[in-house]
């Protein structure tokens, strides 16, 4: 008797929550960390859409605490004062304009949603509202002391109640079990759905009860069809649940009603591409590595938190050769919905985004070679990264075939008859390998771009039998080559 109901439920879930609603032939969410809304709109039109990117994760769009003590650090955006859409990135009109412009060119917007807590101190917000941290009073919502959990400190990760009912680093902890609190969160998220967003990154999901989140998500509206979404689709949900094992809370508690950001992914790949594990061992990359099922996961190499505090295993723009290799592997491998980091340069962990003397955000400048200036790293504009987004689009719908390794630090694999990649760490690769590709000449999209039938990088020739001679020197700028059918010369 239960089967038809189960099938119906699964079909309903498949219309959203677990799928990112990318337009056709697009992939990957890029986190344009601390960018202004007007700059994101420009970037959607001039770069992200033409290069095949799926969407943008934006910084929290709601009013946050102005923190002058540390010269406006990045983390002030994670201290909500209200759900008024007004931040240093722009006001509601600028946000709505960006969402419309990005959707118009097929690039989706995902909101970083901070609903676990309010501020960690008192003061004034970016829209001028007041935050009374000691009295737990936020009149612009309004929230009062009765809307929060009792004050205690998150200090025992072996105790799920401590993690979920106490205060994370002193941040006033909302009680999502309250119907009123839920109603304010739902109202905020549905306002964003009305504006045309495609989904939500849920900050600090591990610090909220799964049943409360499930109830909140169940009350979200369908995506706005005026923005090109199909009828009856729910927002894509990707939840921040840091689970590296050994704690009371498991990432699996959150997979029934949304995807989960898989922190083990970048940790293990960061270790492997720095030589801490043999690349050959990546042959069974996936759940056997204690990863979630790919359909439940958002995969990433680094994010705005762990590029600062994640330790030496986390690869970032500061270690570019293995970083680009790990990203190439992520984008070449079918696992998960992939997310890319786009940073501003920083020297200390609290440092805020590029800003003028008045605290206004400075826009990234675009250099003649397509890279960014004004203090922005723009990893998404690195050739080796955006060309692998193109690779992922070209190989969509195929599996891994023709896996090869030397048993150590050299690997290669194909994606059906659409694409092929090879990697080496530490010593030269010279092999005659089966690519699975049709005969012809291909542009290696890591070393160059394929444009108008010519290639600015290496050319790789595939014979009628699908084999090619693959050479990759240990001391080259990049320890990876990638060819695909859309880069055939």
Curated annotation (Swiss-Prot):
Q: Which CDD domains match?
A: AmyAc_bac_euk_AmyA (cd11317)
* Enzyme class name: hydrolase
Cystine pairings recorded for this chain = 44-102, 152-166, 372-378, 443-455
Q: Which GO terms describe its biological process?
A: carbohydrate metabolic process
Q: How is the cofactor bound?
A: Binds 1 Ca(2+) ion per subunit. Binds 1 Cl(-) ion per subunit.
Q: Name one Pfam family in it.
A: Alpha-amylase
Which catalytic residues are annotated?
Answer: 203 (nucleophile), 240 (proton donor)
Co-factor requirement: Ca(2+); chloride
UniProt signal peptide: 1-16
Give site residues, Transition state stabilizer.
Answer: 305
- EC number of the protein: 3.2.1.1
What reaction is this protein's catalytic activity?
Endohydrolysis of (1->4)-alpha-D-glucosidic linkages in polysaccharides containing three or more (1->4)-alpha-linked D-glucose units
Task: Drop me one GO molecular function for this one.
Answer: alpha-amylase activity
Record-listed chloride binding positions: 201, 303, 339
Question: What SMART domains does the record point to?
Answer: Aamy, Aamy_C
Residues reported in the UniProt entry to bind Ca(2+): 116, 164, 173, 207
Could you list this entry's UniProt keywords, alphabetically sorted.
Calcium, Carbohydrate metabolism, Chloride, Disulfide bond, Glycosidase, Hydrolase, Metal-binding, Signal
Q: Which family does it belong to?
A: Belongs to the glycosyl hydrolase 13 family.
Assembly notes: Monomer.
Question: What is the designated name of this protein?
Answer: Alpha-amylase
Q: Which organism is it from?
A: Tribolium castaneum (Red flour beetle)
Highest classification ranks of the organism: Eukaryota, Metazoa, Ecdysozoa, Arthropoda, Hexapoda
């Amino acid at each position: 008797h239960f089967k038809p109901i189960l099938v119906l439920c699964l079909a309903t879930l498949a219309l959203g929550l677990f799928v990112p609603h990318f337009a056709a032939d697009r992939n990957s969410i890029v986190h344009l960390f601390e960018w202004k809304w007007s700059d994101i709109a420009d970037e959607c039109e001039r770069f992200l859409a033409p290069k095949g990117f799926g969407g943008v994760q934006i910084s929290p769009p709601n009013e946050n605490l102005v923190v002058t003590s540390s010269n406006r650090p990045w983390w002030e955006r994670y201290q909500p004062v209200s759900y008024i859409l007004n931040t240093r990135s722009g006001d509601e009109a600028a946000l709505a304009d960006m969402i419309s412009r990005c959707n118009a060119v097929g690039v989706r917007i995902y909101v970083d949603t901070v609903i676990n807590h309010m501020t960690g101190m008192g003061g004034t917000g970016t829209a001028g509202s007041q935050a009374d941290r000691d009295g737990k009073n936020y009149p612009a919502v309004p929230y009062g002391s009765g809307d929060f959990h009792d004050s205690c400190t998150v200090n025992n990760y072996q105790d799920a109640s401590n993690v979920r009912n106490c205060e994370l680093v002193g941040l006033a902890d909302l009680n999502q079990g309250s119907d009123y609190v839920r109603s304010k969160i739902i109202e905020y998220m549905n306002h964003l759905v009305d504006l045309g967003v495609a989904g939500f990154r849920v900050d600090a999901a591990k610090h909220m009860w799964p049943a409360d989140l499930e109830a909140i998500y169940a009350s979200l509206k369908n995506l706005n069809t005026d923005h090109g979404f199909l009828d009856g689709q729910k927002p894509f949900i990707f939840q921040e649940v840091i689970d590296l094992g050994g704690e009371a809370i498991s990432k699996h508690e959150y997979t029934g009603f949304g995807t989960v950001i898989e922190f083990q992914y970048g940790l293990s790949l960061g270790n492997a591409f720095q030589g801490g594990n043999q690349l050959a061992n990546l042959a069974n990359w996936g759940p056997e590595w204690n990863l979630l099922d790919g359909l439940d996961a958002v995969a990433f190499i680094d994010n705005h938190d762990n590029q600062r505090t994640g330790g030496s295993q986390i690869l970032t723009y500061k270690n570019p050769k293995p970083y680009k290799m790990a990203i190439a592997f992520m984008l070449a491998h079918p696992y998960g919905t992939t997310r890319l980091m786009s940073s501003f340069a920083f020297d200390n962990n609290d440092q805020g985004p590029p800003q003028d003397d008045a605290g206004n955000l400075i826009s990234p400048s675009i250099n003649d070679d397509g890279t960014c200036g004004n203090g922005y790293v723009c990893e998404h504009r690195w050739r080796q990264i955006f060309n692998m987004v193109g690779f992922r689009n070209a190989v969509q719908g195929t599996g891994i075939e023709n896996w090869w390794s030397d048993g150590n630090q050299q690997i290669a694999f194909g994606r059906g008859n659409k694409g092929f990649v090879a990697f080496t760490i530490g010593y030269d690769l010279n092999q005659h390998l089966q690519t699975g590709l049709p005969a012809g000449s291909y542009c290696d999209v890591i070393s160059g771009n394929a444009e108008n039938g010519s290639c600015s990088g290496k050319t790789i020739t595939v014979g009628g039998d699908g084999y090619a001679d693959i050479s990759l020197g240990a001391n080259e700028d990049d320890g990876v080559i990638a060819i695909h059918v859309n880069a055939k010369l």
